[in-house]
Amino acid sequence: MYKKLITFLFVIGAVASYSNNEYTPFNKLSVKLYIDGVDNIENSYTDDNNELVLNFKEYTISIITESCDVGFDSIDIDVINDYKIIDMYTIDSSTIQRRGHTCRISTKLSCHYDKYPYIHKYEGDERQYSITAEGKCYKGIKYEISMMNDDTLLRKHTLKIGFTYIFDRHGHSNTYYSKYDF
């Protein structure tokens, strides 16, 4: 088994400014997933030009392996503005692993009040898989990482950036996070 570096690179257009001074705008969210034994990558929303077309509210990428004994080594998340890292997070290696089951690591990006975002596949180093999303998120984004055994959810990590009151399950909360909530 060899280690593959799979990079998800989301470039978000300028976020509309708000009067809240605690909110730090960003224009790039880089997510790197380090995993052993990845056999294939599934994605969706491919158009005729082999470009991935993004609907932020529904878009999901799944990385599937035939066995969950590999788990993942780590996940790095960088929040970047004008090529400067303004915040970073690291999720340590997964501890819940099962042999003999299909392992799915799913990553989902939600952008609310977006304006014509789109996505395309990066054609570069074959050891690296990355996607770039461009557009404007006026209210903030939510990024979810889930790890599953077959259809059983093992772990879920959520990163919310910006005005995320719209991300509660009912959609009517008055609470929002003005900076980052992980």
Curated annotation (Swiss-Prot):
GO-annotated cellular components: host cell endoplasmic reticulum
One Pfam family cited in the UniProt record for this chain: CrmD_SECRET
Name used for this protein in its record: Protein OPG192
Keywords of the record: Host endoplasmic reticulum
Family: Belongs to the orthopoxvirus OPG192 family.
Superkingdom to which the source organism belongs: Viruses
Subcellular location, principal: host cell
